């Protein structure tokens, strides 16, 4: 049987968690018990509905597909903790997975009475009409004086207590079986045929064709063109198979693609309803799953990489290129991490290529201003580079005296802009800037990273030089294909062709340390097997923690506040796992208080590429009063703070010509978003203003002023430093935007060889880090486009040093 155990508290140390963990081990041969934590469950707030959030949907799916639920509750003020009450509220507000589900209550407490009063209240709560759980009567397991009940291994010490728990659990297994028989749905019958339905995915509509026979779901076809490649692929493959195999709608959503997963399930439900059956009956059916016996799987390799995003896959590819073995462990079902969510352009100074493009109005003035900057404002370690850069700029300006000239760039400009872009002061007055040797390594090797990617099959669009929001300068190399998936598709194919092993749904729990050297990892796979990977070196590439709001709030020293309900552009996998692993072996942290918001995110989803996302030279940002409020060419944190100061919600205004410069969209997607009311379109600015509830006169004046600034090449209001197109050709568009968490600059402290350093500044032998899990490069603010340069550069560096220092010496 399969049960879920809910830890009824979010306390870091909990005897109720210890009790469930003991039950998980003790009853492993009888049943599978999956433990669910309340740590990231938001407090219940009816006015801020989070029913569709990943964490709530995950709880709902796990409960609905289990044979029973075990709740371990402590006692707080004679009742249940607020965290437990909140999850039950969420699970009875708009969804009801506990309805009719078998529930066993256990509890541990310091008191001699155990959690008796809390259990009584919990029974009353679970019996409420909106919850309607089937709670096992009697057989209350009350563990009193819990602080002395467990031994050092977390096992119950008193045999009589274990015996009583055995009897309670045996009764619960019988009880769950009886409840399941009572809940068993009657046989279904459908009107046979193929039903065309439309569900809602993450990015828009999902047209589906569902074929039903008289009593079975026979086939599910989905038009996947609206969804982002690399993110929802696993959902499209796995969800239909599981629905058909189990003839049930009670299937688990795919981590990282939960919205799309539920969209597919809802689409089939609509077809079932059209065929004359009740889809709720199919939701009560549970897929038959055999409980795997506890097992240990051991693997030996040269280098193990934690995380299958861009940095991790790059590291694995470089290890394989060197003729060695690599194993990549990824906690989510799909590879790609945040890289598949990236816009695509990666920064690398390539003057020979860039000089074929004309300079934009304002770019030469930006260079002139930088050249005239007082050297005393530059950190000492950067001054020699700054002097050389001034010479380069002065020579360029002398040679390009005409109005436009060609686009200038150099490795030194990239380096100094990365340094200045990351120079920030936190709320405590603490100044931070990028570590010189790391920034130098990044900017010196970024172009080599582009060339290396080309060598393994990534194709770049050399007809345009692009600039992501907040990049400051046009040096973006954009791949052909869809978003960052172009990188991941190529990297995955290369790793697999070279004999690399990729294990998905295998989160790493701890690092293996032997004689002071990190020599592997311990993980758990989807079959609940313990996976031990022995390796000569470990590379952490598991990303940052922008999807972990509590962790952001814990470390934050930059933003005046980070709201509990803040959206994120990130994969839900970005919860700081690698940082936890690193600190478990003594790693130092750097810059943890600085996180980056993406100012131009979808207000509802945090999605980056909805609406019209265009180059910043074409950004026209207006607040809810129809007025510009910021230099749209500024850094991400400048844009974010300005947005927050103006009520957070704002609009990107575009015309038909600017629309043509939008990234990663199609006319069909644009039309669909207009129809859905997430993008606004009108033939006049007056009509557009009325659609979005702002003063038409204010918006019309704002656009007229902006167009004059474009003609003049100068912005006297906000000093925008680069312009391209005017807003002049109908139809006109308004894309609603709002800041969302995007990147965490802080992380494990590394040196320029990607070694992880301990709190004494010494190398942790055998441990390397690359990508967002590492700190020190971007300091207080990351330039747009630099993260991709970072992951591909330091992924290669980490692999090269891991092989040279730990693999080659062993095999030589």
Swiss-Prot record:
Modified residues (FMN phosphoryl serine): 258
GO terms assigned for molecular function: FMN binding; steroid dehydrogenase activity, acting on the CH-CH group of donors
Cofactor: FAD; FMN
Catalytic activities: dihydrourocanate + A = urocanate + AH2
Gene3D superfamilies: 3.40.50.360, 3.90.1010.20, FAD/NAD(P)-binding domain, Succinate dehydrogenase/fumarate reductase flavoprotein, catalytic domain
Annotated catalytic residues: 636
Binding site for FAD: 311, 330, 338-339, 343-344, 577, 743, 772, 788
Details of cofactor binding: Binds 1 FAD per subunit.
EC number: 1.3.99.33
Pfam family for this entry, one: FMN_bind
Keywords, ordered alphabetically: FAD, Flavoprotein, FMN, Oxidoreductase, Phosphoprotein
Highest taxon listed in the record's lineage: Bacteria
SUPFAM superfamilies recorded: FAD/NAD(P)-binding domain (SSF51905), Flavoproteins (SSF52218), Succinate dehydrogenase/fumarate reductase flavoprotein, catalytic domain (SSF56425)
Family note: Belongs to the FAD-dependent oxidoreductase 2 family. FRD/SDH subfamily.
Misc remark: L.plantarum strain WCFS1 is significantly more abundant in subjects with type 2 diabetes (T2D) compared with subjects with normal glucose tolerance (NGT).
Cross-referenced PANTHER family: FAD-DEPENDENT OXIDOREDUCTASE 2 FAD BINDING DOMAIN-CONTAINING PROTEIN, FUMARATE REDUCTASE
Protein name: Urocanate reductase
Organism: Lactiplantibacillus plantarum (strain ATCC BAA-793 / NCIMB 8826 / WCFS1)
Lineage: Bacteria, Bacillati, Bacillota, Bacilli, Lactobacillales
């Amino acid at each position: 049987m399969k049960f879920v155990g809910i830890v009824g508290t979010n306390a870091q140390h909990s005897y109720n968690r210890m009790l469930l963990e003991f039950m998980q081990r003790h009853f492993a041969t009888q049943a599978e018990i999956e433990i669910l934590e309340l740590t990231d469950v938001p407090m219940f707030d009816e006015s801020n509905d989070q029913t569709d959030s990943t964490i709530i949907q995950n709880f709902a799916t796990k409960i609905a597909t289990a044979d029973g639920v075990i709740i371990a509750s402590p006692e707080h003020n004679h009742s249940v903790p607020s965290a437990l009450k909140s999850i039950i509220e969420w699970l009875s507000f708009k969804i009801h997975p506990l309805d009719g589900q078998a529930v066993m209550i256990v509890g541990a407490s310091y008191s001699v009475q155990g959690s008796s009063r809390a259990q009584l209240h919990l029974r009353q709560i679970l019996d409420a009409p909106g919850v309607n759980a089937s709670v096992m009567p009697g057989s209350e397991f009350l563990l009193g004086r819990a602080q002395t009940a467990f031994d050092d291994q977390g096992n119950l010490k008193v045999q009589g207590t274990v015996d009583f728990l055995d009897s309670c659990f045996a009764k619960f297994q019988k009880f769950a079986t009886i409840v399941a028989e009572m809940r068993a749905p009657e046989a279904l019958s459908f009107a046979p045929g193929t039903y065309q339905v439309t569900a809602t995915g993450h990015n828009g509509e999902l047209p589906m064709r569902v074929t039903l026979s008289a009593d079975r779901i026979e086939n599910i076809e989905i038009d996947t063109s609206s969804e982002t490649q690399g993110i929802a692929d696993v959902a499209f493959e796995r969800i239909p198979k599981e629905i058909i195999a189990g003839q049930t709608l009670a299937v688990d959503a795919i981590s990282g693609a939960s919205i799309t997963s539920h969209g597919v399930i809802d689409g089939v439900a609509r077809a079932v309803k059209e065929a004359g059956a009740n889809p709720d009956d199919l939701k009560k059916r549970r897929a038959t799953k055999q409980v795997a016996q506890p097992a240990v799987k051991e693997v030996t390799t040269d280098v193990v990489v934690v995380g299958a995003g861009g940095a991790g896959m790059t590291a694995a590819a470089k290890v394989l290129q060197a003729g060695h073995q690599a194993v990549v462990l990824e906690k989510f079902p799909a590879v790609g991490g945040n890289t598949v969510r990236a816009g695509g352009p990666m920064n690398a100074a390539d003057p020979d290529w860039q000089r074929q493009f004309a300079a934009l109005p304002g770019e030469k003035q930006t260079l002139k201003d930088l050249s005239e900057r007082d050297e005393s404002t530059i950190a000492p370690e950067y001054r020699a580079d700054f002097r050389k850069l001034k010479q380069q700029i002065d020579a360029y300006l002398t040679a390009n005296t005409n109005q436009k000239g060609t686009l200038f760039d150099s490795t030194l400009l990239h380096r100094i802009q990365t340094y200045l872009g990351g120079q920030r002061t936190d709320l405590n007055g603490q100044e931070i800037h990028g570590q010189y040797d790391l920034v130098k390594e990044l900017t010196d090797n970024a172009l080599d990273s582009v060339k290396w990617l080309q060598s393994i099959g990534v194709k770049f669009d050399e007809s345009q030089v692009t600039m992501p929001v907040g990049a400051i300068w046009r040096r973006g190399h954009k791949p052909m294909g869809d978003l960052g998936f172009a990188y991941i598709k190529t990297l995955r194919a290369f790793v697999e062709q070279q004999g690399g092993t990729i294990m998905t749904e295998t989160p790493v729990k701890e690092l293996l340390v032997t004689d002071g050297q990190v020599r592997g990892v311990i993980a758990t796979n989807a079959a609940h097997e313990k996976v031990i990977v022995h390796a000569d070196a470990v590379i952490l590439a598991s990303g940052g923690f922008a999807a972990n709001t509590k962790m952001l709030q814990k470390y934050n020293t930059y933003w005046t506040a980070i709201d509990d309900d803040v959206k994120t552009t990130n994969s839900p996998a970005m919860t700081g796992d690698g940082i936890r692993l690193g600190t478990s072996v003594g790693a130092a942290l750097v810059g943890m208080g600085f996180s980056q918001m993406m100012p131009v995110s979808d207000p509802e989803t945090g999605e980056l590429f909805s609406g019209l996302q265009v180059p910043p030279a074409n950004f026209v940002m207006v607040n809810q009063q129809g007025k510009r409020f910021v230099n749209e060419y500024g850094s991400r944190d400048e844009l974010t703070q300005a947005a927050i100061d103006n009520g957070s919600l704002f609009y990107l205004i575009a015309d038909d010509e600017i629309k043509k410069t939008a990234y990663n969209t199609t006319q069909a997607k644009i039309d669909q978003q207009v129809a859905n009311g997430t993008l606004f379109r009108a033939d006049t600015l007056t009509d557009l203003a009325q659609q979005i509830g702002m003063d038409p006169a204010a918006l019309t004046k704002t656009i007229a002023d902006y167009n004059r600034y474009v003609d003049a090449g100068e912005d006297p209001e906000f000093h925008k430093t680069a312009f391209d197109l005017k807003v002049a050709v109908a139809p006109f568009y308004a894309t609603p935007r709002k800041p969302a968490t995007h990147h965490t600059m802080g992380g494990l402290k590394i040196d320029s060889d990607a070694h992880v350093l301990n709190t004494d500044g010494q190398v942790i032998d055998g441990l390397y880090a690359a990508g967002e899990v590492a700190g020190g490069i971007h300091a207080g603010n990351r330039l747009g486009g630099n993260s991709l340069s970072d992951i591909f550069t330091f992924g290669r560096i980490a692999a090269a040093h891991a092989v040279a220092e730990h693999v080659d010496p062993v095999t030589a």
